[in-house]
Amino acid sequence: LKIPLYIVLSVKFLNFFSENLAVKYAAFLFSIPIKFRRPDRENEYFLNSIHKKIYIPEVDKKIMTYELEASGPKVLLVHGWSGRGTQMHALAKECHKEGMNVFSFDLPAHGQSSSNTTLIPEVVKCVRSLYQKIGPFDYAIGHSIGGICIMNSLRFGDKYKKMVTISSPHVNVDMFKDFIFKICLLYTSDAADDQA
Protein backbone atom coordinates (compact mmCIF):
# COMPACT_ATOMS: atom_id res chain seq x y z
CA LEU A 1 0.00 0.00 0.00
CA LYS A 2 1.45 3.33 -1.06
CA ILE A 3 0.98 6.22 1.35
CA PRO A 4 -0.18 9.43 -0.41
CA LEU A 5 2.54 12.04 -0.79
CA TYR A 6 0.58 14.71 1.11
CA ILE A 7 0.55 12.46 4.20
CA VAL A 8 4.28 11.76 3.96
CA LEU A 9 4.99 15.50 3.57
CA SER A 10 2.73 16.43 6.48
CA VAL A 11 4.51 13.90 8.72
CA LYS A 12 7.92 15.22 7.65
CA PHE A 13 6.76 18.80 8.27
CA LEU A 14 5.52 17.97 11.77
CA ASN A 15 8.64 15.95 12.51
CA PHE A 16 10.82 18.93 11.58
CA PHE A 17 9.19 21.02 14.32
CA SER A 18 8.18 18.38 16.85
CA GLU A 19 8.96 14.68 16.84
CA ASN A 20 6.30 14.22 19.52
CA LEU A 21 3.59 15.79 17.31
CA ALA A 22 4.71 13.71 14.33
CA VAL A 23 4.48 10.50 16.36
CA LYS A 24 0.99 11.42 17.66
CA TYR A 25 -0.15 12.21 14.12
CA ALA A 26 1.31 8.90 12.87
CA ALA A 27 -0.51 7.01 15.65
CA PHE A 28 -3.76 8.70 14.65
CA LEU A 29 -3.21 7.82 10.97
CA PHE A 30 -2.47 4.21 11.91
CA SER A 31 -5.86 3.97 13.64
CA ILE A 32 -7.80 4.81 10.45
CA PRO A 33 -8.61 1.76 8.30
CA ILE A 34 -9.17 2.18 4.57
CA LYS A 35 -12.80 1.51 3.69
CA PHE A 36 -13.52 -0.48 0.55
CA ARG A 37 -16.86 -1.02 -1.16
CA ARG A 38 -18.36 -4.47 -0.57
CA PRO A 39 -17.76 -6.52 -3.76
CA ASP A 40 -20.58 -8.47 -5.42
CA ARG A 41 -19.15 -11.83 -4.30
CA GLU A 42 -20.09 -10.94 -0.69
CA ASN A 43 -23.70 -10.01 -1.48
CA GLU A 44 -25.16 -13.50 -0.97
CA TYR A 45 -23.81 -13.65 2.59
CA PHE A 46 -24.90 -10.08 3.23
CA LEU A 47 -28.44 -10.73 1.96
CA ASN A 48 -28.90 -14.12 3.66
CA SER A 49 -27.59 -13.14 7.08
CA ILE A 50 -29.42 -11.47 9.93
CA HIS A 51 -27.96 -7.98 10.45
CA LYS A 52 -27.97 -6.33 13.82
CA LYS A 53 -26.10 -3.35 15.24
CA ILE A 54 -24.83 -4.08 18.73
CA TYR A 55 -23.56 -1.44 21.11
CA ILE A 56 -20.25 -2.33 22.76
CA PRO A 57 -20.07 -0.18 25.92
CA GLU A 58 -16.42 -1.07 26.57
CA VAL A 59 -15.43 0.92 23.46
CA ASP A 60 -18.52 3.17 23.20
CA LYS A 61 -19.15 2.08 19.59
CA LYS A 62 -21.79 0.19 17.62
CA ILE A 63 -20.74 -2.73 15.47
CA MET A 64 -22.69 -4.35 12.64
CA THR A 65 -23.14 -8.09 13.12
CA TYR A 66 -24.06 -10.82 10.63
CA GLU A 67 -25.53 -14.18 11.58
CA LEU A 68 -26.44 -17.33 9.66
CA GLU A 69 -28.64 -19.20 12.12
CA ALA A 70 -28.40 -22.94 12.67
CA SER A 71 -28.84 -25.27 15.63
CA GLY A 72 -25.26 -26.55 15.66
CA PRO A 73 -22.11 -25.22 17.29
CA LYS A 74 -21.45 -21.49 17.26
CA VAL A 75 -18.53 -20.13 15.24
CA LEU A 76 -17.16 -16.59 15.34
CA LEU A 77 -15.44 -15.18 12.24
CA VAL A 78 -13.23 -12.09 12.66
CA HIS A 79 -11.91 -10.29 9.57
CA GLY A 80 -8.67 -8.36 9.16
CA TRP A 81 -7.75 -4.67 8.94
CA SER A 82 -9.65 -2.67 6.30
CA GLY A 83 -12.00 -5.63 5.74
CA ARG A 84 -15.65 -6.39 6.51
CA GLY A 85 -17.57 -9.13 8.29
CA THR A 86 -18.97 -10.22 4.92
CA GLN A 87 -15.44 -10.70 3.61
CA MET A 88 -15.37 -14.16 5.19
CA HIS A 89 -18.41 -15.23 3.15
CA ALA A 90 -16.85 -18.45 1.79
CA LEU A 91 -15.93 -19.69 5.28
CA ALA A 92 -19.33 -18.63 6.59
CA LYS A 93 -21.11 -20.56 3.84
CA GLU A 94 -19.10 -23.76 4.43
CA CYS A 95 -19.53 -23.62 8.21
CA HIS A 96 -23.27 -23.01 7.82
CA LYS A 97 -23.53 -25.96 5.40
CA GLU A 98 -22.07 -28.11 8.20
CA GLY A 99 -24.89 -26.98 10.52
CA MET A 100 -22.97 -24.32 12.44
CA ASN A 101 -24.47 -21.08 13.69
CA VAL A 102 -22.15 -18.54 12.02
CA PHE A 103 -21.52 -15.12 13.46
CA SER A 104 -19.31 -12.34 12.08
CA PHE A 105 -19.10 -8.58 12.52
CA ASP A 106 -17.59 -5.43 11.07
CA LEU A 107 -14.75 -4.28 13.31
CA PRO A 108 -15.17 -0.74 14.68
CA ALA A 109 -14.45 1.82 11.91
CA HIS A 110 -14.93 -0.92 9.29
CA GLY A 111 -17.86 -1.74 7.02
CA GLN A 112 -21.13 -0.56 8.57
CA SER A 113 -19.85 -0.21 12.13
CA SER A 114 -19.57 3.19 13.76
CA SER A 115 -16.47 5.38 14.12
CA ASN A 116 -13.57 6.26 11.85
CA THR A 117 -10.78 4.99 14.08
CA THR A 118 -9.95 1.83 16.00
CA LEU A 119 -6.99 -0.14 17.31
CA ILE A 120 -6.38 -3.77 18.26
CA PRO A 121 -7.30 -3.33 21.97
CA GLU A 122 -10.77 -2.08 20.94
CA VAL A 123 -11.31 -5.04 18.64
CA VAL A 124 -10.27 -7.44 21.42
CA LYS A 125 -12.89 -5.80 23.66
CA CYS A 126 -15.50 -6.29 20.92
CA VAL A 127 -14.61 -9.98 20.58
CA ARG A 128 -14.86 -10.41 24.36
CA SER A 129 -18.16 -8.54 24.54
CA LEU A 130 -19.66 -10.67 21.76
CA TYR A 131 -18.38 -13.82 23.48
CA GLN A 132 -20.21 -12.77 26.66
CA LYS A 133 -23.41 -11.48 24.98
CA ILE A 134 -23.90 -13.97 22.15
CA GLY A 135 -21.47 -16.79 22.89
CA PRO A 136 -19.88 -18.70 24.17
CA PHE A 137 -18.53 -19.65 20.76
CA ASP A 138 -17.36 -23.19 20.15
CA TYR A 139 -14.99 -22.17 17.38
CA ALA A 140 -13.27 -18.99 16.23
CA ILE A 141 -11.61 -18.19 12.92
CA GLY A 142 -9.66 -14.98 12.48
CA HIS A 143 -7.87 -13.47 9.50
CA SER A 144 -4.81 -11.27 10.05
CA ILE A 145 -5.66 -8.75 12.80
CA GLY A 146 -8.81 -10.78 13.49
CA GLY A 147 -6.61 -13.74 14.46
CA ILE A 148 -4.53 -11.53 16.75
CA CYS A 149 -7.71 -10.32 18.47
CA ILE A 150 -9.07 -13.84 18.97
CA MET A 151 -5.73 -14.96 20.45
CA ASN A 152 -5.78 -11.96 22.80
CA SER A 153 -9.34 -12.77 23.91
CA LEU A 154 -7.96 -16.08 25.24
CA ARG A 155 -5.75 -14.15 27.66
CA PHE A 156 -8.88 -12.68 29.23
CA GLY A 157 -10.70 -15.97 29.70
CA ASP A 158 -12.57 -16.65 26.45
CA LYS A 159 -12.41 -20.36 25.60
CA TYR A 160 -12.90 -22.08 22.26
CA LYS A 161 -12.84 -25.79 21.43
CA LYS A 162 -10.75 -24.87 18.39
CA MET A 163 -9.35 -21.66 17.02
CA VAL A 164 -7.90 -20.99 13.56
CA THR A 165 -5.84 -17.99 12.52
CA ILE A 166 -5.18 -17.21 8.87
CA SER A 167 -2.18 -15.06 7.95
CA SER A 168 -2.02 -13.46 11.37
CA PRO A 169 1.28 -11.73 12.08
CA HIS A 170 3.12 -13.30 14.98
CA VAL A 171 4.62 -9.94 15.96
CA ASN A 172 2.56 -6.74 15.80
CA VAL A 173 5.75 -4.67 15.76
CA ASP A 174 6.34 -5.55 12.09
CA MET A 175 3.10 -3.82 11.05
CA PHE A 176 4.00 -0.68 12.97
CA LYS A 177 7.56 -0.64 11.64
CA ASP A 178 6.30 -0.99 8.07
CA PHE A 179 3.81 1.85 8.53
CA ILE A 180 6.38 4.14 10.18
CA PHE A 181 8.84 3.41 7.37
CA LYS A 182 6.20 4.17 4.71
CA ILE A 183 5.35 7.55 6.23
CA CYS A 184 9.07 8.37 6.42
CA LEU A 185 9.50 8.64 10.19
CA LEU A 186 12.22 6.01 9.68
CA TYR A 187 14.19 6.47 6.49
CA THR A 188 15.60 3.00 5.81
CA SER A 189 14.33 -0.49 6.35
CA ASP A 190 17.56 -1.17 8.29
CA ALA A 191 16.64 1.68 10.64
CA ALA A 192 13.23 0.07 11.07
CA ASP A 193 14.90 -3.23 12.01
CA ASP A 194 17.17 -1.43 14.48
CA GLN A 195 14.14 0.05 16.26
CA ALA A 196 12.59 -3.37 16.96
Predicted ranges, named:
Residues 2-54:
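An N-terminal hydrophobic leader/cap segment in hydrolases
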Residues 81-92:
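The serine-hydrolase catalytic nucleophile loop
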Residues 92-112:
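Conserved alpha/beta-hydrolase
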Residues 117-134:
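Alpha/beta-hydrolase active-site loop
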Residues 141-142, 146:
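Gly/Ala-rich beta-loop-alpha elbow adjacent to hydrolase catalytic centers
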Residues 147-157:
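Short glycine-enriched nucleophile-adjacent loop
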Residues 165-173:
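Active-site nucleophile loop of the alpha/beta-hydrolase fold
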Residues 187-192:
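Conserved small/polar residues in nucleotide/adenosyl-binding loops
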